[in-house]
UniProtKB/Swiss-Prot annotation:
Oligomerizes as a right-handed, spiral filament on DNA at oriC. Plays an essential role in the initiation and regulation of chromosomal replication. ATP-DnaA binds to the origin of replication (oriC) to initiate formation of the DNA replication initiation complex once per cell cycle. Binds the DnaA box (a 9 base pair repeat at the origin) and separates the double-stranded (ds)DNA. Forms a right-handed helical filament on oriC DNA; dsDNA binds to the exterior of the filament while single-stranded (ss)DNA is stabiized in the filament's interior. It comes from Francisella tularensis subsp. holarctica (strain LVS). This is Chromosomal replication initiator protein DnaA. Residues 155-371 are annotated as: Domain III, AAA+ region. Residues 69-154 are annotated as: Domain II. Residues 372-491 are annotated as: Domain IV, binds dsDNA. It is found in: Cytoplasm. The lineage of its organism: Bacteria, Pseudomonadati, Pseudomonadota, Gammaproteobacteria, Thiotrichales.
């Protein structure tokens, strides 16, 4: 049995039958020592495989082969001229992932804790009628070629538990609410709506809810999925002429967890079905948990009736962790990997990688891999060498004076107001926001930031960061302003 054959068995456990048969089974992987070439038949297929399943393929090959490897993606079939793209190109997230030293046990990463419902295949609808009813994307799914069976939902991964979720000011409210609904589903915070940027822990929290609720009540019917899978489940129930079964499965859940709910916006047929599913569950006191990258009102194309229902319960944000929490995440991750990481190295990485937790862990993996390969300890010097491209990109992008200008323009004040001694609320709050942004987006120390804001003490900067972090949890207006400013500055 080849390494890829072993990988296929593991990958199959992580995906629905439809995903596996449609996307993974058709690709061919050629191994030449530590080089794995993934042949994807065409450019569209290659892009989709890389973006959607690249991390899964990488971690599975690492599990079966080891960490010392290179993966190339080709847009050609296995025979003929090869046009390849190495996934380690560039300094950002894909490169971090490629050098990961994390080895995931099959029992940890792929164990299924729910039994998906299987539908048997019947006649397909034609594309034109499906397109009229559902729209282009949904029609494409209905007419997609599949094998003989299809399952609802996605498996929960047992590695996602509350104990492995590092808590800080940026996520403690979301974590507390998640714990509450896992213990008493349908009683408080229904629905629980968790929003925040990519890679900040929303999926971790969501699956932790499912896993903990299973421990509290082993007989509970828990369905975890994401919006893409929910769409596939729905349109395939139409294609298989079994909508009643789809409705029975989803509407009989005790706890329904849907990740990235924003993607049902604009999918008219699916949105309508979800609306009725939501109502059925809510009226029966069943718990609904949703995640999104945006606050409900900001999801473009989402029906107003859904926005209204999302507001029935509790909406909480998950933001980028502060420096102390990022350090704690790195130290815990290193410990889980059985690696020793000096506190000063963890602090250096946390200071210089501030985009999201996923890239933070990727940077750690990169440092640990390099130190292990060179038989060195993961010192600051090793981290500096490994991450110099990341640091250069970040410093090139963000300067404190640029942050001050963007914030001043946003609040219609002058830059010199931010550096002045004025303490009026319309000046003090933007100043605190600008300081917090400077702390998050630059590698400057607290004293350096304080000096840039009129020679203020480093404790003033610390207070500003803590104040804004707390306000972002409780004040939607502040949170929205902060996210908009982050976007403007990072462009």
């Amino acid at each position: 049995m080849t390494t890829w054959d072993k990988c296929l068995k593991k990958i199959k456990k992580n995906l629905s039958t439809f995903e596996y048969k449609t996307w993974i089974k058709p690709i061919h992987v050629e191994q030449n020592s530590n080089l794995f070439t993934v042949y994807c038949n065409n450019e569209y297929f290659k892009k989709h495989i890389k973006s959607k399943y690249g991390n899964l393929i990488l971690s599975t090959i690492q599990e079966c082969h080891g960490n010392d490897l290179i993966i190339e993606y080709s847009n050609k079939k296995f025979s003929g001229e090869k046009i390849t793209e190495v996934i380690t190109a560039g300094p950002q997230a894909n490169f971090f992932s490629t050098t990961s030293v994390e080895i995931k046990d099959e029992s940890e990463d792929t164990k299924v804790v729910q039994e998906p419902k299987i539908l048997k295949k019947s006649n397909s609808k034609d594309f034109s009628s499906s397109q009229e009813l559902f729209g282009f994307d949904e029609a494409m799914l209905i007419t997609a070629k599949e094998d003989e069976e299809y399952s609802f939902g996605l498996p929960l991964k047992e590695k996602y538990v509350f104990d492995s979720f590092v808590v800080g000011d940026a996520n403690k409210i979301a974590r507390a609410a998640a714990m509450q609904v896992s213990i008493n589903p349908g009683k408080l915070h229904n629905p629980l709506f968790i929003y925040g940027g990519s890679g900040l822990g929303k999926t971790h929290l969501m699956q932790a809810i499912g896993n903990h609720a299973r421990e509290v009540n082993p007989n509970a019917k828990i369905i975890y999925t994401n919006s893409e899978q929910f769409i596939k489940d729905y349109v395939n129930s139409i294609r298989l002429q079994d909508q009643d079964e789809f409705q029975r499965v989803y509407r009989s859940a005790d706890i329904l967890l849907i990740d990235d709910i924003q993607f049902i916006a604009g999918k008219e047929g699916t949105a309508q079905e979800f609306f009725h599913t939501f109502n059925a569950l809510y009226e029966n006191g069943k718990q609904i948990i949703l995640t999104s990258d945006k606050y409900p009102n900001e999801i473009e194309g989402l029906e107003e009736r859904l926005v209204s229902r999302f507001g029935y319960g509790l909406t909480v944000s998950v933001d980028m962790p502060d420096l102390e929490t990022r350090i704690a995440i790195l130290l815990k991750k290193a410990h889980d990997l059985g690696q020793k990481l000096p506190n000063e190295t963890a602090a250096f990485i946390a200071e210089n990688v501030r985009t999201n937790v996923r890239e933070l862990e990727g940077a750690l993996n990169r440092v640990l891999t390099t130190s292990k390969f060179n038989h060195k300890d993961p010192t600051i010097e090793v981290a500096q060498a490994c991450l110099r491209d990341v640091i250069k990109i970040q410093e090139k992008k963000v300067k404190i004076d640029n942050i001050q200008k963007v914030v001043a323009d946003f609040y219609r004040i002058r830059v010199k107001d931010l550096t002045s001694n004025q303490r009026s609320r319309n000046i003090a709050r933007p100043r605190q926001i600008a300081m917090s942004l400077a702390r998050e987006l630059t590698s400057h120390s607290l004293p350096e930031i304080g000096n840039a804001f009129g020679g203020r003490d480093h404790t003033t900067v610390m207070h500003a960061v803590k104040a804004i972090t707390k306000l972002r949890q409780s004040n939607t207006s502040i949170s929205d302003d902060y996210e908009l400013l982050l976007d403007k500055i990072s462009r």
